[in-house]
UniProtKB/Swiss-Prot annotation:
UniProt record, GO biological process: farnesyl diphosphate biosynthetic process, mevalonate pathway; isopentenyl diphosphate biosynthetic process, mevalonate pathway
Protein name, entry field: Hydroxymethylglutaryl-CoA synthase
InterPro entries tied to this protein: ACP_syn_III_C, HMG_CoA_Synthase, Thiolase-like, Thiolase_N
UniProt source species: Pyrobaculum neutrophilum (strain DSM 2338 / JCM 9278 / NBRC 100436 / V24Sta)
Pathway: Metabolic intermediate biosynthesis; (R)-mevalonate biosynthesis; (R)-mevalonate from acetyl-CoA: step 2/3
Disulfide bonds: none
EC class name: transferase
Residues reported in the UniProt entry to bind CoA: R241
Amino acid sequence: MGRVGVVSWGAYIPKYRIRTEEVARIWGDDPLRIVDLYLVDEKSVEGIDEDAVTIAVEAARRALRRATLDPRRIGAVYVGTESKPYAVKPISSILIDALGLSNNVFAVDMEFACKAGSEGLMAAVGLVESGKVEYGMTVGADTSQGEPGEHLEYSASSGGVALVVGREGVAAELEAAYAYASDTPDFWRREGSPYPMHGEGFTGEPAYFRHVINAARGLMAAYGYKPSDFAYAVFHQPNGRFPVRAASTLNIPMEKVKPGIVVTHIGNTYNASALMGFAKVLDQAKPGDKILVVTFGSGAGSNAYVFSATDLIKERQNAAVPTVEAMLRDKIYVDYAQYLKMRKMIKLFEY
């Protein structure tokens, strides 16, 4: 696929955290059982003045700062989220003014559950490869929803990642891409509903594992890769168990997966989930390292990518931008009452 690839990346994780044991305490669940079930110790919580827009803006600013890139050279902006503050009003157009981009930019919000942000990656790559734009940006950002007392509440969290793609200054070249999708009713949220629903019988084998495994195997078969070719492997992380099992099924050893695991510390950031693991790996990769990234979105589909780190990776890593590891350590714990307030889940009624 030529020299098109990731020029820069930026991530943002809200510093607030709520421990799994605190949520379990409120609902009378056994905290040890819940932690063992999901392998999520705590999750990130957006501040009371944060939403998917502010998270996307901060991640995108960090991506631009890392490459010292003139924002007016960005010709396309894609945003993937399940947490739009507005039913009808794009986040991508807000980014144009917030980041100082040109008004002559292709901008759109995308939707495919948790893989919309990574779908924007391919759209941006396509425009760059065609010569229509010099650089493109895709952002995955969410303040994901989980109904109080329902098991999604233990993992649904907040965060964002932005990727800039182009031909010049590439830090991680995109070598291969492959997709696998089908109509699978594993997870949905109807219009006007504040919380999603999920068909528990569909979330494992028919949805996540079928699509993730087929996308990864399809990519390796189509391009001739072997598990031993990859220095790192990153998967969508709805919980701590699924990506580990996916890697085992693909005969990828844990030492290649563990560096990209973030769900244990921040939960499932939905559109930023696999991308956050990818950003964490980019923070530490060496020139020549090949990185397998497999995203997943309910409904359902997976995209698999292979990136190869270039000699510019070290220069990008040395930029004055917070690493994912640093953000994982920078945290303030809140209790359940503060969590409800910050997530605006306490409703006031006028009489």
